[in-house]
Regions:
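DNA target-recognition patches
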Residues: 7-10, 20-54
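Structural detector for helix-capping/boundary residues
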Residues: 4-7, 34, 116, 137
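Short, solvent-exposed loop/turn positions at domain surfaces
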Residues: 17-18, 58, 128
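A short glycine-rich beta-alpha junction/loop motif
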Residues: 73, 88-96, 127-152
Length: 176
């Protein structure tokens, strides 16, 4: 196993749009941290939409890709999801986009981000203003541990994703 800073493990680290955008019916979704919960992106027809022109301005210099990790960094800090479909949606600044380098699988990195050690690092680095947040530079400095074997990363990542789904199912069952 190796340890390095999160920023050294990523080929891409950015947060969502900082601008204000007018609502537009039928346009691409503009989601925020509230839409990332329990490892998934949750949205419905009441969520904001922006014009295609605004969307293209936001993504003039980058694009989201399937497999990117979404991490909430403002408000509710530390929720994650892996982007399954990148078309027709973008995010406000409350969400960071993490794209692991080729030697780290997204599923494995998500498992690492969910560990109590990583979550404690997030907690200790957050700014305490009106709404708590973590700066990308501080996020990039958090140490992560990983195995260099992609096969081992895959097995670990799959195991914990299945376990997370099972826990979510049991939680839902308890609520009914």
């Amino acid at each position: 196993w190796e340890q390095r800073k999160l920023g050294e493990s990523l080929s891409f680290l950015k947060d969502g749009t900082h601008g204000t955008h007018a609502d537009a019916d039928g346009g691409p979704l503009l989601l925020s941290a509230k839409n990332i919960k329990d490892g998934t992106i949750k949205w419905d027809e009441t969520d904001r939409r922006i014009s295609q022109e605004e969307f293209e301005k936001i993504h003039a210099n980058f694009s989201l890709k399937t497999g990117d990790i979404l991490l909430t960094i403002v408000g509710s800090i530390g929720e994650i999801a892996i982007l399954k479909e990148s078309e027709g949606l973008t995010f406000q600044r409350s969400v960071a986009f993490l794209r692991p380098k080729e030697d780290i699988l997204s599923e494995f990195l998500c498992t690492e981000i969910q560990t109590p050690i990583f979550q404690k690092e997030l907690e200790s680095r957050k700014s305490t203003s009106a709404q708590p947040g973590i700066y990308l530079g501080d996020l990039a400095e958090i140490p992560v541990k990983y195995t260099i074997s992609l096969d081992e990363q895959n097995k670990i990542g799959e195991y914990f994703l299945k376990l997370d789904h099972l826990i979510t199912l049991h939680q839902r069952k308890c609520l009914t």
